[in-house]
Amino acid sequence: MDYDTLASKYLKFVYDFEDVTYQNNYFVTDEYKSDLEQYLKSIHDGEKISQSKIDSMETALLTKVPKEKRCLISKLVFAYGKHGNVENKLLKYGTKDALTHAIQKDVKPYENNIITSEIFKDESEYTDTYMDPAINTSCQSNCQAMMFTISEMKLTDIKNATRLEKLFTIVAATINKYGMPRHNIRYRYEWETMKDKPYHLAAWINSSIEMIACVVDHHTYMIARELIVKSFTNRTSLAKLVSSPMTVLTAMLPIRGTVITTENLELEYSSKSVNYLISEEMAEDFMKAIEQLRDEGLEIYQDYYEKWFKSPDPLTFPNIALIYSFSFHVGYRKQALSDAVYDQITVTYDDNVNMEMYKEYSERIENEIFTILKDKVVHEDKRLEEYELSALLSMSSASNGVLREIDFGGQKVRSTKKNMHVIDDMYHKRYTTDIPPVDERNPIPLGRRDVPGRRTRAIFILPYQYFIAQHSFAEMMLKYAKREREYSEFYSQANQVLSYGDVTRYLDSNSILCFTDVSQWDASQHNTRVLRRSIIRAMERLKQLTHNTNIHKAIDIYIQSQKNLENSYVLIDKKAIQYGATASGEKQTKIMNSIANKALIQTVLGKLMTDYTFDVKMIRVDGDDNYAIVRFPTAITEKLLSEFTSKLRSYYSEMNVKVKALASLTGCEIAKRYIAGGMLFFRAGVNILNHEKRNQDSAYDMAATLYANYIVNALRGLTMSRTFILVKICQMTSIKITGTLRLFPMKSILALNSTFKVFDEVDYVINYPISELFIQLQRKLSSIKAKSKIADNIAKSPQFKSYVEFLNKSLTADENPIVSDGIKLTEKAKLNSYAPIALEKRRDQFNMMVSFLQNPTTFKSETVVTINDVLYFISGFIKINSSVALPKEENNTMPLLPVTIKRTLNYFGLRTHDYDIKGSSSTMSKIIKQYSVYTPGIEELYEVVNKSIDSIRGYFASFNVPKADVDTYISTQMYKHDRFKILQAYIYNLLSVNYGMYQLVDLNSAKFFDHVIHTPMAKTPTAVFMIDLALRLKVINHCIEKGEVITVSVHANKTDYLKLWRMLWNVKTMNSPYSKNSMFDE
């Protein structure tokens, strides 16, 4: 159903009382402006105006303005009665099915869902940290949205509506029993509200409603019911318990044909057949996991798992996958930091370890780091020489761990942000790159990371000097990892599908796939010291390779950062506590973990080689996980597999490393993805109504996040009710004007690509409306610019100016306006993460938007060329020739994708490469990288490459690029190639080819030659490229929307191409809450 229709129905559902009037606001093309002004004037002439009067005025307007020249932009609701009280609507559900709070054994008091006043003595002790849903929408609106969704479903699918109603009754009855948790203005749940209610009530209501919205059949109903009931009491281990058996089950599907990655990184089908085999250990692991489910009273899952275990069936595996996905939706486990790090602090030190293995492990780390950095040091890489500048340019606006008051030329600011501290320190001559100690006297403050189904992790918030010390080295290691297939997390040009084909490629009946979850890795205290020492040794060796004093300094402070952290103290409950483990928070965390992880698995495999004869076919590390495939000369037997598994485990324990090591023949499960029966699965575990942490986003931004998360889950096999999602969007984008007045933006605002875009009219498909009407609307919306006084004041202050000047002078030989503007913009953008600035901008933007939505006539248009103008122009000379039904064959590589998408993928093929959307493949970008630490953005490259040859020379010169290089660049007319390359990247960027489903489709598929027909003539390559890509996306969109493959032909003449080419140089990108959440670019 159309969004606007749905929103109107929903409003009637909410405002179900007499005294309410609705006023529709329209946007019209310029020629009908006076009619719209007339309409607005006539309905604003009195105090309170009757609905019938408004309706007659509206009818008058609609008869004057033809349909294609107007669109509904908002609804204004005047509700004078008592708001349709949610509590009253819930009363009919009674309290018969209400759940009762109960205490759990062996958990901390706050982890129990018991009455809040039994956890905290009084208001002074109370905190909402451990139950805060952290989202700007309320339990009331969630209930309202659910009741409306059920009432809508009754019209079309009574059977499923009954299921939803049954589940919702549990939630409603529980609310009736304890009372509705009411939030304050900032959507926080305070002591007064919570003291007589179960502590986790709000988070539980949200997660339960989220799970109810996912119910589509009996199976999902059963999963959801069990989780809803059990998560009321168990707030700690539920997700883990329910998803534990998965690890074994992935190994229990035979492979009958699969997709593999070839030598030259392409995907191809292989008809290989491999039977599954699991070891005794794994069967025991499984029975243990099942036993735990039984103890917890989770009979439904236990039965289902056991049945499937006895006779594994590829066709019902998606049902297992659903349980696995659902289990994450019970919400985040939020612990007190002192409990979260308890394990790490109390790790016992064991000297009874295999020193041989430790020595090898340590040497491997040292050699890897040495190998990675050797050339860079010998060639005196720019980024090492200017390590400090390089780090300052990419200094984030994250916390520096301490709150300071800073005076920016009269603008006082209290902030913890790194960038502000650096600017202030430089101005007051306090700035230094010396590494501050992190001992008892200066313990490290901790941040947190909450994940469903796992313990809370602590994050170090280190002083910015640590970032400066590590930045350059970490960046180089990352760059190296991008070229090494072993590092599957960083390996460039690859996506998840390639890494998957990589695994299936080597599987056969002679091979064992070992996979290890190393997530407790950080905690095992052995890791830290040996890791830091290996790093230091590698660094000392690197130091011998050069006499460059700058590089020596860089290496020295890097070594110092390692020495300091080796014996670090952290701040917990205002006490300094010694903490040995690697916590994240360092720049190098990710890459170092991967290097150590690779060294670990190589060491263990090396040890196994003394017991068996085998070939290591591949090793991969991906974050906390590692996996390897080893091929034996003979077929694998159950006995061999069991022996191998227990040996693998014993070698890990000889190093005193707490890991979960497993081996199978056909499947594996790691944190990011799991492979079973030669198919690829992802966990659809993104929470929608509970967030991990609070940020500066408004409810409007959060609506966009909600939609983006809904799409991610849907692409991973968990479909939520779209009605429910749209109603949530309707609630969260509404703007309260006064107590009685609320404004609801409509689809033409929410789904148009402007700064206000929230969702797509058709899921998985980005539509760029291209009528005259929408282009005018878009131009008007573009004129709504957010301003922030605080930001402007900071930018005017002497501190800010001198900092930008310092960066400029250090970076460029002679001031280049393009570069200095770029730096200024970047630095100013970093200020946006400072809450008061973000809020000021948002508020400013919303005030203007509110007046726009009520009366668009007073706004001036911004003359801006957007992608819509380009597509509108193209639409003038293309024809749809024919359309045929999309063939029913599905690509089953990812069985959980929606059906239409699987058919589309089967037709066009899977994409294996990401496209360059940053312009980094251009020669210009490469030359600058060679001589400077500055990385120009795509917009900047785009601007420079289109300037005169002299400007290009000047641009290069300001980065000290040798004259010889510049001459070569110009004489070989490289800039002409670059124009094309950069524009190409820019177009990819504009058409968001890395969005949602588009990133799965092979846009270079030969199939498109049959469906996009060009006229043969001498053409402008850029224009042709643009038309071609736009039409390819149009074809894909049509497949998804209508289930048809269309053939499109282009009928343009030479002037059209030239005109389009000129247009392309002025196209501007649009940023919105939608694009912020939906675009996946690394």
From Swiss-Prot:
Single annotated GO MF: RNA binding
GO annotations of cellular component type: virion component
E.C. designation(s): 2.7.7.48
Keywords: Magnesium, Nucleotide-binding, Nucleotidyltransferase, RNA-binding, RNA-directed RNA polymerase, Transferase, Viral RNA replication, Virion
Subcellular location: Virion
Enzymatic reactions: RNA(n) + a ribonucleoside 5'-triphosphate = RNA(n+1) + diphosphate
Record flagged with keyword RNA-binding: yes
Chain ranges of the RdRp catalytic domain: 498-670
InterPro entries, alphabetized: DNA/RNA_pol_sf, RNA-dir_pol_4-hel_dom, RNA-dir_pol_luteovirus, RNA-dir_pol_reovirus, Rotavirus_VP1_C
GO term, biological process aspect, one: DNA-templated transcription
Known cofactor(s): Mg(2+)
Subunit structure of this chain's protein: Interacts with VP3 (Potential). Interacts with VP2; this interaction activates VP1. Interacts with NSP5; this interaction is probably necessary for the formation of functional virus factories. Interacts with NSP2; this interaction is weak.
Protein role: RNA-directed RNA polymerase that is involved in both transcription and genome replication. Together with VP3 capping enzyme, forms an enzyme complex positioned near the channels situated at each of the five-fold vertices of the core. Following infection, the outermost layer of the virus is lost, leaving a double-layered particle (DLP) made up of the core and VP6 shell. VP1 then catalyzes the transcription of fully conservative plus-strand genomic RNAs that are extruded through the DLP's channels into the cytoplasm where they function as mRNAs for translation of viral proteins.
Family, similarity comment: Belongs to the reoviridae RNA-directed RNA polymerase family.
Protein name: RNA-directed RNA polymerase
The species this protein was found in: Rotavirus C (strain RVC/Pig/United States/Cowden/1980)
